[in-house]
Amino acid sequence: MTSLIRIAARNLLFLAVMLTATGCREASHEATAALPALGANINETTVSGISSGAYMAGQFQMAHAKRVIGAAIIAGGPYGCSESVFADTIPGAGTAFLNLSKAVNGCMLDLLESWGVADPTELAKKAEARAAKGEIDPIADVTRDRIYLFTGTSDRTVAPSIVRHAAEFYAKLGVPAANIELVSNIPAGHAFVTDDNGNACEISAEPYVVDCNYDQAGALLKQMYGTLQPRAETATGDFVNFDQRPFAGSEMSSSGLAETGVVYVPKACRETPGCRVHVAFHGCAQNRETVGDAFIKESGFARWADTNRLIVLFPQVAASPINPQGCWDWWGYTGPEYLTRNAPQIAAVNRMLDGLQASGGRA
């Protein structure tokens, strides 16, 4: 127990440094276009993410379950895991600090299991309460979803037990066992896995893309969508850099979003409306500001998109003094509504889906 306390204390010091950091990399300015209006079918949207992106994928799924039919959680845990018991009593940054402490110690390292963190049963009850209050979509819409979960055997950042807790959380909500796939036998580090790009399989380092001879993009898309056409040899569509600011509106400065996001548009989706949308959330230190287009172009999503009429949205978060690693908000740095459909990041990404659904402006 003493060693656990020592680790927790070290993590708290790390958190204090994170929250008081004064500098971050300057965002580069680049030419951007408007998000193309493609007449997309957003009622069969799927989401995926790694690390903080995994938590955001789960949060977006819960908030907009009527639109989302599947979620892929890579090196992430259950929805609401980081929320402190003091969330309703300590205002502002104090709650975010407590949430972040819980996030690292209880939702990544799994050091708080003896204190009931992360309890899938309790988290499912809290999710049901949020749904009853109308803060997220009805749980009944989640129970029809297809779920993919992944933990690499060489991942020392997020404990395998945390990912298993996520699988248990979905089961507690009522998602059938047949709809849940947990992959835990690949020696990957803390990274997105491919069969032809990235670092050596066991590495956990930028750009957090590794080659394990496993096509994770294809695996998770098949789990969520079912049978797909074989992927293309090379991607032939367009990676469009678009301005994210209109989707955050007046909350842009506090949303944590980067100015520029990316959407991959297959040629078939420019020519004919009705393409489905997959939203891929990057992990911490995996945004374009940090690793360029490595995750976007090396993950393999585009090759599957080309042959299956699938638009892939890559929204982006920026590094900042309160979020120096450019993580998605899964502990409340954007405010207390971070788990609800009113969360700045969730609301902005949902507006991006609305923009893709619009017609008459295909570019």
Label every model-predicted segment:
Residues 41-93, 133, 229, 362-363:
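Primarily recognizes the serine-hydrolase "nucleophile elbow" in alpha/beta-hydrolase
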